[in-house]
């Protein structure tokens, strides 16, 4: 049983149906033996559970009559209508202001606890990951390149792409005239290079990286798809040290959140 919450809640709602009708229809799809009255009562309960104020009167409102944060709550209610064991949340805080983002993430955490439900969070926000997740998988070109406990990946990243992501995040405590970036561009999925998919952009790539595709290999408590991160790959090359330092500074700023 899987439920999904997508990036833009407005496009996930039918503009020609009230939110009450949409929820009722979805519940009846998952529970065909339920009466329409019971389904509507359950729809109201889901709106209340996800924090919609004055839920009774708002059942008959249209999607455009809700704020962005409220629409996201309604989409979460729709995702819960089938009583999922896994909730996939794809960038659930996109286009929301910071205070509303925090409320939505707290709602997802609360629902996961109360419903004993797993959550798969898809996001680029390292702060959200540090505050919310237990484990993190870093993906590049359609593959997992690093996976481990959140604190380990944030504080001790092993893959050059993870180092690059961490290093490219501006440090609010340090004044700088330029931003660190990862060289090059993401390859198309129909044109992934031989060897390691990241090697054209990697500052540490060597001949083996260009010819042999690395498997996920154990490195401490994590797994990393990198020859340099393998126990036989030796120390991280000097070319990656500046990314490491920037990544460490950012991880240090997240220490309290990750804890």
Provide a role label for each language-model segment:
Residues 21-38, 48-52, 65, 148:
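ABC-type ATPase nucleotide-binding domains, specifically the catalytic core motifs of the NBD
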Residues 38-57, 166-167:
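Conserved ABC ATPase "signature" region
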Residues 53-56, 149-254:
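Short catalytic/signature loops enriched in Gly
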Residues 61-66, 70:
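Conserved ABC ATPase signature
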Residues 84, 88-178:
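P-loop NTP-binding/switch modules centered on Walker-like glycine-rich loops
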């Amino acid at each position: 049983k899987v439920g999904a919450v997508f990036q833009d809640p407005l496009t996930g709602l039918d503009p020609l149906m009230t939110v009450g009708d949409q929820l009722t229809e979805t519940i009846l799809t998952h529970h065909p033996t339920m009466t329409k009255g019971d389904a509507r009562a359950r729809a109201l309960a889901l709106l209340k559970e996800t924090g919609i104020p004055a839920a009774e009167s708002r059942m008959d409102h249209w999607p455009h009559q809700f704020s962005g944060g409220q629409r996201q709550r309604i989409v979460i209610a729709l995702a819960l209508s089938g009583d999922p064991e896994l909730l996939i949340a794809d960038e659930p805080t996109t286009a929301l202001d910071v205070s509303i983002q925090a409320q939505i993430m707290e709602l997802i955490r609360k629902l996961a606890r109360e419903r004993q439900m797993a959550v798969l969070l898809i996001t680029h926000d390292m702060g959200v990951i540090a505050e919310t997740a237990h484990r993190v998988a870093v993906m590049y070109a359609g593959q997992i390149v690093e996976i481990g406990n959140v604190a380990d990946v944030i504080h001790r990243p092993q893959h050059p792409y993870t180092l690059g992501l961490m290093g490219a995040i501006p440090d609010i405590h340090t004044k700088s005239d330029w931003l660190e970036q990862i060289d090059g561009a993401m390859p198309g999925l129909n044109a992934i290079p031989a060897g390691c998919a990241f090697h054209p952009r990697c500052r540490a790539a060597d001949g083996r990286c260009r010819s042999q595709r690395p498997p996920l290999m154990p490195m401490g408590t994590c797994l990393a798809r990198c020859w340099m991160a393998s126990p036989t790959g030796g120390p991280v090359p000097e070319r990656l040290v500046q990314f490491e330092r920037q990544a460490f500074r950012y991880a240090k700023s997240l220490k309290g959140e990750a804890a």
